[in-house]
UniProtKB/Swiss-Prot annotation:
GO cellular component entries: chromatin; nucleus
GO molecular function: DNA-binding transcription factor activity, RNA polymerase II-specific; E-box binding; protein dimerization activity; sequence-specific double-stranded DNA binding
Residues in the signal sequence: none
Species of the source: Homo sapiens (Human)
Span list, region Disordered: 1-71
Database matches in Pfam families: HLH
Key word ATP-binding present: no
Protein name per its UniProtKB record: Oligodendrocyte transcription factor 3
Length: 272
């Protein structure tokens, strides 16, 4: 009985022992943490004390300088922004003024009606009109080049000096020919017929000139001033062919200078 009671009493007293042990252990752990924190803080304090006074003053001055610099920079930036806005506005105003002047100059040369009642074209309409006008001029220039190439190029024989007929025929046959004659040589030929027995048979290169090209317009002179059917080409364009550029035959040297002067005087009288 005594042994049982002692065991029960020992069991009942064991929880108190455990609580005391845990409390003591917790107190020791807490004290250890506090001592560690105190040592860290004391170490930091010692380091701060060991830092030289110059570095501390330098850091404070740097912070103060940065704050003051930021304030000055902010004030200057507002002034700079105002100046920048003024510069941008002036540059944009000048650009628009130059653009309007250029558009006005382009409208002056555009082929459309000018006047107070005509509405002014917009910039886009002016540019489109200028584009179409340039394309039209380019196509006209290309067509003119093509026509000139046909006149002086491969189709040169269609309206100029053709094959020379060397067959000797009657002078009346050459006179009744449908081919026109060069005006100067024709006048010389007529004057030669009046003064000397010079006929078209002796000048085979004169009676074989073909009629003018159909693309060439007829001269706008009145009928009284018409100088012949062959003059409508020779008055406009010089003949570049070899037959017209070559010197005259030896038998044409019989024409004197007086006859040529008389021919030129007659042509001037006709043109008056």
């Amino acid at each position: 009985m005594n042994s049982d009671s002692s065991s029960v009493s020992s069991r009942a007293s064991s929880p108190d022992m455990d609580e005391m042990y845990l409390r003591d252990h917790h107190h020791r752990h807490h004290h250890h943490q506090e001592s560690r924190l105190n040592s860290v803080s004391s170490t930091q304090g010692d380091m701060m004390q060991k830092m030289p006074g110059e570095s501390l003053s330098r850091a404070g001055a740097k912070a103060a300088g940065e704050s003051s610099k930021y304030k000055i920079k902010k004030q200057l930036s507002e002034q700079d922004l105002q100046q920048l806005r003024l510069k941008i506005n002036g540059r944009e105003r000048k650009r628009m003024h130059d653009l309007n002047l250029a558009m006005d100059g382009l409208r002056e040369v555009m082929p459309y009606a000018h006047g107070p009642s005509v509405r002014k074209l917009s910039k886009i309409a002016t540019l489109l009109l200028a584009r179409n006008y340039i394309l039209m001029l380019t196509s006209s220039l290309e067509e003119m080049k093509r026509l000139v190439g046909e006149i002086y190029g491969g189709h040169h024989s269609a309206f100029h000096c053709g094959t020379v007929g060397h067959s000797a025929g009657h002078p009346a046959h050459a006179a009744n020919s449908v081919h026109p004659v060069h005006p100067i040589l024709g006048g010389a030929l007529s004057s030669g017929n009046a003064s000397s027995p010079l006929s078209a048979a002796s000048l085979p290169a004169i009676g074989t000139i073909r009629p003018p090209h159909s693309l060439l317009k007829a001269p706008s002179t009145p009928p009284a001033l018409q100088l012949g059917s062959g003059f409508q080409h020779w008055a406009g364009l010089p003949c570049p062919c070899t037959i017209c550029q070559m010197p005259p035959p030896p038998h044409l040297s019989a024409l004197s200078t007086a006859n040529m002067a008389r021919l030129s005087a007659e042509s001037k009288d006709l043109l008056k």
